[in-house]
């Protein structure tokens, strides 16, 4: 099994206690894969309340910090794709750097960013 990167839609699905994301997450952990959550994704999904299901999911994830290099690459990706969604761009750059599968509720926008970079990106919709 390859690495996995979660976008905001995956975190929202976990908080909604959707069976599909939990099955995928349990399978990843069973195969000793710790999904990556870019810090920008966490910021977009976190609303300050208890968010018990999201907190439970995050315990099995690695939070990837927003480094200067990642920020620059995400900004360049936004420019190439003519979009302003830096969170989506961060997900794409992050996943491409490792060859991860991206778990998303927004495959169209992520595919558009990857296409603008002429890079193949594996997507799984939730």
Give residue ranges: language-model regions.
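Short, well-structured N-terminal submotif of metal-dependent ribonuclease cores
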Residues: 1-37, 46-59
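A general structural signal for well-ordered alpha-helical segments in protein cores
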Residues: 21, 42, 51-54, 71, ...
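General small-molecule cofactor/ligand-binding pocket signal
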Residues: 36, 64, 122-124
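Short beta-strand scaffold positions
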Residues: 37, 65, 86, 104-105
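Acidic catalytic patch
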Residues: 43, 61-81, 93, 107
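Short, hinge-like loop/turn segments at secondary-structure boundaries
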Residues: 51-56, 81-82, 120-122
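Acidic, metal-associated active-site segment
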Residues: 85-101
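Acidic, PIN/NYN-like endoribonuclease modules and their adjacent C-terminal/linker elements
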Residues: 96-126
């Amino acid at each position: 099994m390859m690495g996995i990167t979660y976008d905001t839609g995956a975190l929202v699905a976990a908080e909604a206690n959707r069976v599909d994301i939990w099955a995928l997450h349990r399978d990843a952990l069973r195969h000793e894969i710790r999904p990556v959550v870019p810090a920008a994704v966490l910021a977009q999904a976190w609303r300050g309340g208890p968010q018990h299901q999201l907190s439970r999911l995050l315990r099995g994830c690695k939070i990837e910090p927003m480094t200067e290099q990642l920020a620059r690459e995400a900004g360049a990706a936004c420019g190439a794709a003519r979009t302003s969604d830096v969170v989506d761009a961060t997900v794409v750059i992050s996943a491409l750097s490792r060859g991860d599968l991206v778990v998303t509720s927004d495959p169209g926008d992520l595919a558009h960013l990857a296409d603008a970079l002429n890079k193949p990106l594996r997507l799984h919709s939730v």
